[in-house]
Amino acid sequence: MSDSDTALVARVIASDDRGAFELLVRRHQSAVRNFLRRLARNDSERANDLAQETFIKMYQGIASYRGTARFTTWLFRIAYHTFLNDQRGRHANEEFNDDEHGNVADTTAHTADALDVDRALERLSVRQRAVFDLHYKKGMTHSEIAETLELPLGTIKSDLVRGHEKLKEWLTGGSHEQIA
């Protein structure tokens, strides 16, 4: 039976167990990279760099993990703040640029619909993308998301409702804006 995240954290804190740290990284690196990739609008190279920075920060601050929340809640909070710090350095309100994503051949209606949804999700604010990702991809509850992003529960619920409204508008053609 594999060790729980909490047990691995305890081993890292108690004896600087590199093997336990490596296991934590292997266990969570894919989820962290995917989360960051979606926040970074599918920029895999940037997501990989941010994931590496996230795990460095995790190691440096692991003694601050108290176990009052799930380890993944704590880890995704680090990832989210790492992304926000990087984003501030790049330009806080970066415009979505369709040209950087290229045009994908419309081979099937399903592929086109999925592409439209992905592009629409990319148009949401960073915070709304994070809320959607943590809720729909990671299966976190509203309370867990609020704790992870350090936001009030009402803000999380509002972001989900407003995000749904925006997506519906963009995807049903209720807006004059095109997703392209």
For each feature predicted by the language model, list its residue ranges.
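N-terminal module of bacterial RNA polymerase sigma factors
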Residues: 1-26, 30-31, 122, 169, ...
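C-terminal edge and immediately downstream basic/flexible tail or linker adjoining helix-turn-helix-like DNA-binding
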Residues: 41-42, 119-123, 147-150, 164-180
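Short, basic/polar amphipathic helix motif occurring as a linker/hinge flanking DNA-binding modules
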Residues: 2, 86-112, 177-179
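Sigma70-family region 2
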Residues: 13-14, 38-42, 52-70, 89-91
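Short, charged helix-capping/linker segments at alpha-helix termini
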Residues: 13-23, 33-53, 153, 180
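Amphipathic, Lys/Arg- and hydrophobic-enriched alpha-helical face
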Residues: 25-44, 61, 121, 170-173
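A short pre-motif secondary-structure segment
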Residues: 131-135
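Arg/Lys-rich amphipathic alpha helix in sigma70-family domain 2
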Residues: 60-67, 77-97, 110, 162
